[in-house]
Amino acid sequence: MSVDAATVRKIAQLARIAVTDAEVPHLQGELNAMLAFVEQLSEVNVEGVEPMTSVTPMAMKKRQDVVTEGDIADDIVKNAPMTENNFFLVPKVVE
């Protein structure tokens, strides 16, 4: 897969990043290099390799699952700038 200049501009627009015409070729090269690396990774033979979540073997500490009443809604919303009936109020962002 190859990224063209129009795709670089589209990605920049979606990311809300100002990109000048002079920067487009450099970014195009960088994105193409990243995609080439990802394509190269897909060719690696991983048959027989177990999936892992960490480079060091570790087990997560488990706690007893205990049912509680909760009743902490007031504590949760006390630092919010705007609340109503223990719900967070946020400014409208879509018209």
From Swiss-Prot:
Family annotation (SUPFAM superfamilies): Glu-tRNAGln amidotransferase C subunit
Transmembrane segments: none
Top-level enzyme category: ligase
UniProt keyword Disulfide bond present: no
UniProt-listed GO biological process terms: glutaminyl-tRNAGln biosynthesis via transamidation; regulation of translational fidelity; translation
Matches recorded under InterPro entries: Asp/Glu-ADT_sf_sub_c (IPR036113), GatC (IPR003837)
Keyword Transport on entry: no
Entry EC no(s): 6.3.5.-
Keywords recorded for this protein, A-Z: ATP-binding, Ligase, Nucleotide-binding, Protein biosynthesis
Reactions catalysed: L-glutamyl-tRNA(Gln) + L-glutamine + ATP + H2O = L-glutaminyl-tRNA(Gln) + L-glutamate + ADP + phosphate + H(+); L-aspartyl-tRNA(Asn) + L-glutamine + ATP + H2O = L-asparaginyl-tRNA(Asn) + L-glutamate + ADP + phosphate + 2 H(+)
Lineage top rank: taxon: Bacteria
GO MF term (any one): asparaginyl-tRNA synthase (glutamine-hydrolyzing) activity
Quaternary structure (record): Heterotrimer of A, B and C subunits.
Record PANTHER family: GLUTAMYL-TRNA(GLN) AMIDOTRANSFERASE SUBUNIT C, MITOCHONDRIAL (PTHR15004:SF0)
Summary of the function given for this chain in its UniProt record: Allows the formation of correctly charged Asn-tRNA(Asn) or Gln-tRNA(Gln) through the transamidation of misacylated Asp-tRNA(Asn) or Glu-tRNA(Gln) in organisms which lack either or both of asparaginyl-tRNA or glutaminyl-tRNA synthetases. The reaction takes place in the presence of glutamine and ATP through an activated phospho-Asp-tRNA(Asn) or phospho-Glu-tRNA(Gln).
Family statement: Belongs to the GatC family.
Name of the protein this chain belongs to: Aspartyl/glutamyl-tRNA(Asn/Gln) amidotransferase subunit C
Provenance organism: Bradyrhizobium sp. (strain ORS 278)
Native organism taxonomy: Bacteria, Pseudomonadati, Pseudomonadota, Alphaproteobacteria, Hyphomicrobiales
Gene name of the encoded protein: gatC
